[in-house]
Amino acid sequence: MIMSTSRLDWQHSQDALRDEVGRVTALLRSIRDPGAILAVGEWDLAEVAMHLSQGWLGIPGLARGDRSALYDLLPDRAGVAGDSLVRDIADLGDVTTRLVRADPERHLSMLADRIEACAKQYFVDCTRQSPDELHPWLIQGITLPLAAFTCHLLNETVVHGYDIARAAGRRWRINPAHAVLLMDQFFVPLIQGADPRMLVNADAAAGVKATFDVRIRGGSRFHLHFVFDDGALRVETSSARRVDCHLSADPVAFLLVFWQRQSQWAAIAKGQLMAWGRKPWLAARFRSFLATP
């Protein structure tokens, strides 16, 4: 069950998103020559910026029931997954790669303008809807509240802003409060709304029955049980369930480890990830149990 969003959380998530949009667009406009520097995988800096701009086209489009901006780039996707973009999470990587290749724009200032324009319209849309109103998400069969769409955009903007800044050799601070918000209002609703096996690494989690008590520092409400059951995952509010491993995590470190931008061992060495309990050694395997697009 996905929790409802308080008025205060709804305002905080929009404020955080506005702040990150301002930061990332200013960053893009400040980079004069992105060159061919690799930023994420095989994507260079400009391609990551393009991907982020397409996220700003597609995610708000899904929330308003208009997928035309993405279908214009990939006409063969129209109607393939109903009101969503893909049928299965395994298809998402290929489709996002094709989208980036389909749009030749690589001028960073133009991409910044696109992000700003999409953000401006999205915030207008937010004034007309409830944060708890459900909409079809990227993957067919998953519906999420508008608040989760907002924090999905926050996740994309924070993480790819970090990618772009690193590729450009810039220092980039991730606000811990923003990391808590996107985990609380995007990660958790997504896990709760998805098939229990969708976000699990089936090979790594096969046969594993373990409950992790995850505590994100600075997030008083982010104290949840991640329950793995032979390849399935549920997220529950803290209860009397017997815990195998307690995890205390710095929110920024948890975010970067989750998205494989930082080694978990580096975070452990810095005290950003700590474990205790009946089976503390399971902490070293926690990230390997999770699958991400």
Annotate each predicted stretch with a short phrase.
Residues S220-D250:
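Acidic/His-leaning functional-site neighborhoods
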Residues H12, A16, E47, H51, ...:
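Alpha-helical initiation/capping and key positions within long helical/coiled-coil segments
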Residues M1-M50:
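Non-cleavable N-terminal signal-anchor transmembrane helices
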Residues S239-P293:
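C-terminal interaction segments
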Residues M183-F228:
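A glycine-rich beta-turn/hairpin centered on an aromatic-Pro dipeptide
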Residues I2-Q11, L57-R128, D132-L134:
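Short, helix-capping/interhelical loops that line the mouth of catalytic, cofactor-
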Residues V100-I174:
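Contiguous mid-protein beta-loop-alpha structural module that forms a pocket-lining wall or clamp
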Residues R32-A81, Q140-P196:
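Short, contiguous alpha-helical
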